[in-house]
């Protein structure tokens, strides 16, 4: 049985951020320097009968824009992932909405686990 625990998903701070030109797609090019800080969410992944995403801890009830759910929805829509029947528990320690990149860090950490577990289809 798979049990991956104590995955640390670190926060970051922008040491500087310069907004450059606006692109044709409406976004802006930026120049930035980031630094990882010693503050992290902790992620645990265990086998389950279906995909479950559970948030615990600091401000967990305030999560309205679930990046991890968006990730799995996109991967399934694009048919890029095999069945993923796991429970993902995220213990939130990074303050939500503080600009510390907690949600993005959580997604990046989970993508790395998916690669290690060979969950992606060969297409």
Question: PLM features: residue spans?
Answer:
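ATP-binding N-lobe of GHMP and related small-molecule kinases
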Residues: 1-98, 115-122
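Short, small-residue alpha-helix embedded
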Residues: 104-118
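Flexible lysine-rich "adenylation lid" loop at the C-terminal edge of ANL adenylation domains
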Residues: 100-102
